[in-house]
Amino acid sequence: AGYLQMPMVGVTMFWSYGYYNQRIGEDGNVEVAYIRKHCDFLTDINESVEVEVYGEKVKVKAYKLEPGIFDTCPVYYLTTDIEENSEWARSISHKLYDGNEKIRIAQETVLGIGGIRLLQKIGYNFDCVHLNEGHALPAAFELLIRLKYWEKNLF
């Protein structure tokens, strides 16, 4: 999309520890390690939004992958792993494919609702939204709420 200069933007999660790293231990068995990821190529845009997750207000901070770095469209990375959040809220963006169902639903809520709120806050007006599988389904709910608000207040 970036190479073709398509008018697109991406939103994804910034996983503090990613999936996991593997290595073969001295005993010959596979060892799993969660190693904190650092991405110096992401820009802190000093923007955040708030999303309610299981009754807790969670601050969602955004970083941006600038289009020129990997010849992509702009991509915004969302994280909850910031000091303003509780330890539980920070863990929402720790691991990709977390086995805890409660965390997985929280991740989808942060990505979907937080993503829509961020894009609108920083000035994106969009006509089309692509949701990858059900992972960002809460985005559809956020858009529906906003549509009902505009219909009620404009017509």
Describe each region flagged by the PLM:
Residues 2-155:
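Catalytic cores of carbohydrate-active enzymes across secretory and cytosolic contexts
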